[in-house]
Amino acid sequence: MATAASNHYSLLTSSASIVHAEPPGGMQQGAGGYREAQSLQVQGDYGALQSNGHPLSHAHWITALSHGGSGGGGGGGGGGGGGGGGGGDGSPWSTSPLGQPDIKPSVVVQQGGRGDELHGPGALQQQHQQQQQQQQQQQQQQQQQQQQQQQRPPHLVHHAANNHPGPGAWRSAAAAAHLPPSMGASNGGLLYSQPSFTVNGMLGAGGQPAGLHHHGLRDAHDEPHHADHHPHPHSHPHQQPPPPPPPQGPPGHPGAHHDPHSDEDTPTSDDLEQFAKQFKQRRIKLGFTQADVGLALGTLYGNVFSQTTICRFEALQLSFKNMCKLKPLLNKWLEEADSSSGSPTSIDKIASQGRKRKKRTSIEVSVKGALESHFLKCPKPSAQEITSLADSLQLEKEVVRVWFCNRRQKEKRMTPPGGTLPGAEDVYGGSRDTPPHHGVQTPVQ
């Protein structure tokens, strides 16, 4: 058995380059380095599959074999026949290292020794018994796990592997490679569903390891999983079908939807243009202003419209919707105005009660010169001065007051911030006429 163990070590060294050659005294570093080298080699090479379709290379196969007989082989390294007996019980063709704990070799190194001296045959027997008990427990656990995996559906095995990854997940992947073909077929995606098959430890979307599913396996697993089962704890509720559309019947059916304005009542753009043209002509012929029409509509029908709205309606500047709303009201107003064109009616009374705006006051040239001369003397006269000036010029007091207000505003616009312009007296002489846009106007009452 010692020879077999040494051959086993030579195979590992030649095929996978896992164990480095050490001098005779190199055993003092402990057996943990040997185990760690194996683990690092297997974990690093798991990301690449062989060309023949098998997930394990030759080095991985030999490494998996080393887990089965490493307990006895390590003990028989330098102890002779006693250590060889320990290696015979742990067969190198073990079923699988699934869930196998990290067991260090049973070599006890003395301080300052060569590393091949043991404490005695009693310690070897005790260690051998412990190893046998541990192997029996591992075999029982493996059988239970295999039975549970056979009973589970494939998609549940896939989710269990992704939701509970552990430190020995890469070993479970190696165990899946040793499964017989019948078990691999019954378990579906067990081989490729382990979380250890990742690229340099990268995780897929959602924080779960990205499995290397084949396209056929992925489709076969995803379809029944999404169609029938959803074992995630935060599963989405089943989407309810959309509510049925409201019943639609013929136009006369009570369940049908009726538009307040049917297609027959909705005017076209040509109709609106023709009506606006006729309305404007009739309004001017009857002698009503746009403001009178807006006020009459507010008094008669409760909808107050401004002069601007009526103007925009006649110019076709409103939206189509607003034009359609305003057309029937204006049509009723036209009918009312045409029927009462010969006698004073409520429309005339409403128009007479509308906003009264005083006409523009025109001042004679001589009167304007007198106001200009008084303005140069006193730009802001008092109320008594305005009254006396209005009496002397035979003007209304309000007209004189408004003229002085407009004149002061004109002076502000024409005078720069530095002071008065030179020759202002000549500019504002009596022979000059005030521009028409600065004439006397009375305020709106």
UniProtKB/Swiss-Prot annotation:
Known tissue expression: Expressed specifically at high levels in the brain.
CDD domains: homeodomain
Stored Pfam families: Homeodomain (PF00046), Pou (PF00157)
Segments for region (Disordered): 63-173, 203-269, 336-361, 411-445
Composition bias, Gly residues: 68-90
Record field: compositional bias (Basic residues): 227-237
Annotated Low complexity bias: 125-151
UniProt feature coiled coil, ranges: none
GO molecular function: DNA binding; DNA-binding transcription activator activity, RNA polymerase II-specific; DNA-binding transcription factor activity; DNA-binding transcription factor activity, RNA polymerase II-specific; HMG box domain binding; identical protein binding; RNA polymerase II cis-regulatory region sequence-specific DNA binding; sequence-specific DNA binding
Keyword terms of this UniProt record: Activator, Differentiation, DNA-binding, Homeobox, Neurogenesis, Nucleus, Phosphoprotein, Transcription, Transcription regulation
DNA-binding region: 356-415
Start and end residues of each POU-specific domain: 264-338
Function noted in UniProt: Transcription factor that plays a key role in neuronal differentiation. Binds preferentially to the recognition sequence which consists of two distinct half-sites, ('GCAT') and ('TAAT'), separated by a non-conserved spacer region of 0, 2, or 3 nucleotides. Acts as a transcriptional activator when binding cooperatively with SOX4, SOX11, or SOX12 to gene promoters. The combination of three transcription factors, ASCL1, POU3F2/BRN2 and MYT1L, is sufficient to reprogram fibroblasts and other somatic cells into induced neuronal (iN) cells in vitro.
Designated name of the protein: POU domain, class 3, transcription factor 2
